[in-house]
């Protein structure tokens, strides 16, 4: 796919420089459109024909589509590069977790509630699961409809996937929940029937084949009814699961970017079969975690898992958080003074940088240990401690500047700063610039609570 330029977009704009879109000029707006920082609809002066042409020009090679409606809506796809540094990856892959219609009703309700309530806070962001996938194992439309009903009742904002190969069972599920659930899997045997159901219900349809090449005829047939498709090239299980599956996903992404129309759709990966392929549930969860984490790195647009074990899900969600961070945006927090707990005039004063990960690690470790302290965050341009020391951003003047701006001297009765262990080289510079006594802290923020207690800093006397 040829790289789109701002001039390509500018030629379709009204060139009025009216500012109605929030940009001073149409060229600025064109640049934002190319960088996906604005939408064509933001320009009120575009006529219908120009808007349609612009939307077509800006459409990414991997189609962007939604699953669910309202609070249950998630967006998948929308990517246009092989490597994140070329632009960015968009729309983190939602993680669905399965329930089954052969489970007892209270088991379905309990697991759905676990899925709904699961959350972990990491570096200031809450990581959650995104959907519940209801799988038919009985082939009984009534039992399946009841399972869907329970899953929907016990979830508040989870997207829903309906998983069955039987069109009659799928129809029973749709009778209970029709708010744009994902229908899966459409195979060679049932693609026409499921595609019709998807078209009638305005639902996205997941296509399943055993290999990449076998997806093409499925796509061609499904496109006669709907264009909201997801592609499952056949998740592999066993010794070579990671390599084989990620190779397939990479092949589809590369073909999509090269504008092979049949592969211009989001990809779908299912790891939940490991729950039935492994006798040991711990081993099954571990295999799921390995495979799902690898597929997040290699172009999976949606994951359907079985496990709700936090230790198995956390690597997947952490991987997703890291990979789908926009590399074009500096990862930094606002410099200044932060209160940790309920500090007073005798509480210790610690210094760190405004790199997001550094700040949240330090603040999180202090908060989890119930430490009351003041945290001075200096402006290093979003760089970590060791990098900013080496690059000259972590200096005595930088610390002095934030001390003066925050009036910390009026808030504490002592003059003792604790700097990171990796900033030991600037101890003298900080003391000379600020006039404060400087103590060299720990290399790792997890050791700070013990260090503060050992050094007697939890209650500093003047």
Swiss-Prot record:
Keywords, A to Z?
4Fe-4S, Cobalt, Iron, Iron-sulfur, Metal-binding, Methyltransferase, Transferase
Q: Which Gene3D superfamilies match?
A: 3.40.50.11600, Dihydropteroate synthase-like
Entry-linked Pfam families: CdhD, FeS
The cross-references to NCBIfam families, in alphabetical order and at most eight, read: PRK04165.1 (NF003195)
State the source organism's domain of life. Archaea
Residues of the signal peptide: none
Q: What class of enzyme is it?
A: transferase
Q: Tell me if Iron is a UniProt keyword of this record.
A: yes
Q: Which reaction does it catalyse?
A: 5,6,7,8-tetrahydrosarcinapterin + methyl-Co(III)-[corrinoid Fe-S protein] = 5-methyltetrahydrosarcinapterin + Co(I)-[corrinoid Fe-S protein] + H(+)
UniProt EC number: 2.1.1.245
- Annotated PANTHER family: ACETYL-COA DECARBONYLASE_SYNTHASE COMPLEX SUBUNIT GAMMA (PTHR36214:SF3), PTHR36214
Query: Which residues does the annotation say bind [4Fe-4S] cluster?
Result: 18, 21, 26, 43
**Physiological role:** Part of a complex that catalyzes the reversible cleavage of acetyl-CoA, allowing autotrophic growth from CO(2).
Q: Cofactor stoichiometry and binding? A: Binds 1 [4Fe-4S] cluster.
How does it associate, per the subunit comment?
Heterodimer of delta and gamma chains. The ACDS complex is made up of alpha, epsilon, beta, gamma and delta chains with a probable stoichiometry of (alpha(2)epsilon(2))(4)-beta(8)-(gamma(1)delta(1))(8).
Single GO molecular function? iron ion binding
Task: Quote the protein name from its UniProt record.
Answer: Acetyl-CoA decarbonylase/synthase complex subunit gamma
* 4Fe-4S domain mapped to chain residues: 1-60
In the UniProt record, what gene is named as encoding this protein? cdhE
A GO BP term here is: methylation
Q: Which HAMAP family match?
A: CdhE
- What cofactor does this protein call for? corrinoid; [4Fe-4S] cluster
